[in-house]
Design a protein with these regions (language model features):
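Structured beta-strand-rich core segments of catalytic domains in phosphoester-bond hydrolases
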Residues: 8-36, 70-153
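Acidic/histidine-rich helix-loop elements
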Residues: 41-54, 154-164, 223-226
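Solvent-exposed loop/turn segments at secondary-structure junctions
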Residues: 49-52, 77-80, 102-105, 119, ...
Length: 246
């Protein structure tokens, strides 16, 4: 899994991820928060579940140890949802939005879970030639909002045209009129691309920042995960300016 810690701050922007540093505990004790208001600091995690074969217990362990507030999953199946439910994911992240499952999905549907109650949620926030992109909007202090999405464009093996179109289609999220320093968008998922690919570079130019690049500590190599040393960075947490991480 790929995790990122965000810290709300209206005057600066940036973020960093923490997968190489181990779990980081976040305390809400010094600030007023409710189930309806996102903490000023929060961790997110994204994971490709590989045709729904992911270990539900391992996902739950990561949620607990990394104090995850928002979880994005890709390639999800009904069976995995059942196993996650039996493992009490709803006790940790009681709110969720699923993308609608379709025969054309690439490996499964996408899901987003949250510790906090969304002010809005949709099963598909942008149309791309791939699985639906579910999204939730969370309120933060200071009348700010964060819209978080779980995305999974198709791989080039499923056709280069759809591969590129899926990545480029996510640009619409950064270009939305509602996006501002106080209303940001976070896209998480297996984007099947990296800075080596022109389509991904075009996605960044549309207004997104990449948490991995902001950290400036080298790429987070996540694929293929079954190798001892993964060689490619395909999983990303992208965001529009308006947040800071450490």
């Amino acid at each position: 899994p790929y995790t990122t810690l965000f810290r709300s701050n209206s005057n600066t922007s940036g973020t960093s991820n923490t997968p190489k540093e181990g779990p980081e505990t976040i305390s809400d004790g010094h600030c007023e928060t409710t189930r309806e208001t996102l903490s000023p600091q929060f961790s997110v995690m994204t994971m490709n579940c590989r045709y729904g074969r992911a270990d539900a217990a391992e996902i739950i362990r990561n949620i607990r140890e990394r104090n995850i507030s928002v979880l994005a999953l890709q390639e999800v199946t009904d069976d995995l949802i059942t196993r996650l439910t039996e493992a009490d994911i709803n006790e940790l992240l009681p709110y969720h939005q699923f993308g609608d499952a379709k025969e054309t999905d690439n490996g499964g549907f996408n899901v987003i879970y949250s510790r906090y109650e969304p002010s809005a949620a949709v099963p598909n926030v942008v149309s791309i030639p791939a699985a639906d992109v579910p999204a939730i909007t969370l309120k933060t202090s200071g009348n700010r909002t964060v819209t978080l999405c779980s995305a999974h464009p198709k791989s080039p093996m499923r056709g280069c045209a759809d591969w590129s179109a899926g990545i480029l289609g996510l640009r619409e999220l950064a270009r939305a009129k509602s996006v501002s320093n106080r209303n940001i968008v976070v896209v998480m998922g297996d984007l099947n691309s990296s800075t080596d690919h022109p389509s991904f570079r075009a996605l960044l130019k549309s207004g997104f920042k990449d948490a991995s690049l902001i950290q400036a500590a080298g790429p987070n190599l996540t694929f293929p995960s079954w190798l001892k040393w993964p060689r490619i960075e395909l999983d990303h947490v992208l965001f529009t300016p308006g947040q800071i991480g450490r």
